[in-house]
């Protein structure tokens, strides 16, 4: 059984650039933001941009207050006459045209000036082609099929270009026929290199797989071409826009499934499709499939996080040479479960747009999650009260802080709407909370005081949770950018964040190696270096395009907590 994700799936350079331009403007400008037509051909991304106040228009007359507006030229580009009209209106204009489309425009402009007629091979109704046609000065012809070549008039001076997302094989065939009719034709291969690579990979993959899933907007020309190419090699090809389109598909007959996506398809949709396929495939397995499904269920419901918190609490107690208390392990597990669930319920992303792999479960059983979270926090507080008053007060105020973080909003004139909008606040607050319930609370019992061992335990818990949280956000950086969530990867960028995390991991490694010889902690600290080595392996998820489902990726990151618990077992044995 195999599920393979194409390396070229998802946003191309031009789409990513256009989206980044828009989001950067949205972050720093107070003016109303408009795009001249849909920025890219993906309905889900367009809806997300609308939720941030970025509205597509078809005519500049739709903008009432032109002095307080910014108009962004879509990635597909526009005709020069339209550009002049926009500039003469006095609007502030930002050009997000794909540089590769701009290159084709420059070719047409140059050869039109040299008295050439221009043949554009592409889709007649596509906005890119419409924009290119505007550069021909009325001397352009659009060719969509091989048969249409017969209708073009003979001309010695002909320049041939392609829509950047054209099918390469079809373009070559059309060019050959044009040359038979116009032997002096000047031909440019203006198909984007990423388009060629994407098409080549899909063709090769479709020949090897039992089924192909092509993910992307039904209005996306390049996605439709990918589906057509896959269909030629593999009859079981499905062009889907969202995971909802997969509800009636039977995965039973397919053991090897390939997945690719159009140039306008965001990563979160690809991830959800991968989740759906992995769920379908795992049901076909027997014993291993049952265990895998149980593991994924625990991840989706945050039970796995709760178990991880219990493991970290056990580790922190033993690091500090504190007698193991099942009560504190239960407090940590219950509190982390409750706060994670409440955080997801109170601060959910737009469900129909960027639903995480947990979203379906939270939508279906929302009330049940509220009840279980409420009971968990009540039990955690009761156990804490039974232990000691300082433990109860610490936990109670930590619970209040969590509620304030998720519910309190700032005045409208402030730059940030809530605590959640502060850059990196989610990563830091989560790590501090875990550090308190796993390391500090057990130390408050009886006569234990703050010391070097407690500091090491807190630093270890904080550090490992912070690294896992930030790594998870690196994988979600695209959707977080779109909805305006200021995580550390969004604020610092992917590469800088990975560098920061590697530095933190090295500091953790050094602390663990010296803490026992210096008498600060037990010798367990040596074995815990395994967790740091495991996180370094996980860095590969961020450095390369992951081919696993979102739930599996999240589960592998959270396994760093469980691994810490296994280190205790090894320590006890040896």
Segments from the language model and where they lie:
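The feature marks the mature, well-folded catalytic cores of soluble enzymes
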Residues: 1-261, 267-268, 274, 278-280
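Functional transmembrane core segments of multi-pass inner-membrane proteins
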Residues: 423, 427-472, 477
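Solvent-exposed interhelical
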Residues: 340-374, 463-507
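Intramembrane alpha-helical segments
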Residues: 360-446, 539-543
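Helix-coil boundary and interhelical linker segments in multi-pass alpha-helical membrane proteins
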Residues: 311-331, 380-393, 438-459, 512-524, ...
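Extended hydrophobic alpha-helices typical of membrane-associated regions
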Residues: 356-359, 420, 496, 521-574
């Amino acid at each position: 059984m195999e599920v393979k994700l194409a390396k070229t799936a998802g946003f191309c350079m031009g789409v990513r650039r256009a989206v980044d331009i828009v989001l950067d403007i949205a972050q720093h400008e107070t003016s109303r933001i408009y795009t001249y037509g849909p920025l890219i051909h993906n309905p889900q991304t367009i809806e997300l941009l609308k939720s941030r106040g970025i509205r597509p228009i078809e005519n500049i007359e739709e903008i009432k207050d032109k002095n307080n507006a910014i108009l962004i030229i879509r990635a597909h580009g526009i005709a020069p006459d339209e550009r002049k009209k926009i500039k003469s209106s006095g609007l502030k204009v930002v050009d997000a045209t794909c540089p590769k489309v701009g290159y084709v425009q420059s070719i047409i402009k140059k050869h039109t000036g040299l008295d050439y007629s221009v043949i554009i091979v592409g889709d007649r109704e596509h906005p890119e082609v419409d924009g290119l046609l505007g550069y021909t000065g009325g001397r352009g012809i659009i060719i969509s099929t091989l048969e249409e070549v017969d209708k073009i008039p003979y001309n010695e001076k002909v320049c041939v270009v392609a829509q950047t997302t054209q099918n390469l094989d079809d373009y070559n065939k059309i060019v050959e026929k044009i040359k038979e009719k116009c032997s002096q034709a000047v031909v440019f291969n203006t198909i984007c290199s990423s388009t060629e690579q994407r098409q080549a990979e899909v063709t090769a993959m479709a020949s090897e797989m039992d089924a192909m899933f092509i993910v992307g907007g039904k209005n996306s020309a390049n996605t439709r071409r990918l589906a057509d190419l896959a269909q030629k090699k593999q009859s079981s090809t499905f062009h889907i826009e969202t995971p909802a389109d997969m509800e009636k598909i039977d995965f039973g007959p397919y053991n090897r499934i390939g997945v690719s996506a159009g140039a306008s398809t965001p990563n979160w949709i690809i991830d959800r499709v991968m989740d759906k396929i992995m769920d379908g495939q795992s049901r076909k397995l027997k014993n291993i499939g049952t265990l895998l499904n149980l593991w994924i269920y625990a991840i989706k419901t945050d039970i796995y996080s709760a178990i991880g918190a219990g493991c970290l609490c056990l580790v922190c107690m033993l690091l500090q040479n504190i007698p193991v208390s099942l009560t504190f392990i239960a407090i940590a597990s219950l509190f982390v479960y409750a706060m994670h669930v409440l955080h997801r319920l109170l601060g959910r992303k737009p469900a129909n747009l960027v639903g995480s792999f947990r979203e379906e479960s939270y939508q279906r059983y929302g009330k049940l999650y509220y009840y279980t979270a409420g009971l968990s926090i009540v039990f955690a507080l009761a156990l804490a009260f039974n232990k000691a008053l300082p433990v109860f007060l610490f936990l109670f105020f930590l619970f209040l802080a969590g509620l304030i973080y998720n519910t309190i909003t700032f005045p409208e004139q402030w730059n940030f709407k809530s605590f959640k909008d502060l850059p990196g606040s989610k990563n830091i607050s989560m790590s501090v909370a875990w550090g308190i319930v796993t390391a500090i609370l057990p130390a408050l019992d009886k006569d234990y005081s703050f010391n070097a061992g407690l500091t090491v335990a807190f630093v270890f818990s904080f550090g490992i949770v912070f690294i896992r949280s930030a790594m998870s956000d690196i994988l979600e950086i695209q959707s977080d950018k779109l909805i305006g969530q200021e995580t550390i990867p969004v604020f610092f960028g992917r590469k800088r964040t990975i560098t920061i995390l590697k530095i933190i991991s090295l500091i953790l490694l050094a602390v663990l190696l010296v803490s026992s010889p210096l008498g600060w902690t037990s010798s367990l600290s040596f074995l815990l270096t395994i967790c740091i080595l495991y996180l370094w392996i996980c860095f590969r998820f961020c450095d390369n395009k992951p081919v696993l489902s979102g739930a599996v990726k999240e589960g592998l990151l959270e396994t760093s907590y469980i691994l810490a618990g296994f280190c205790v077992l090894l320590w006890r044995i040896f």
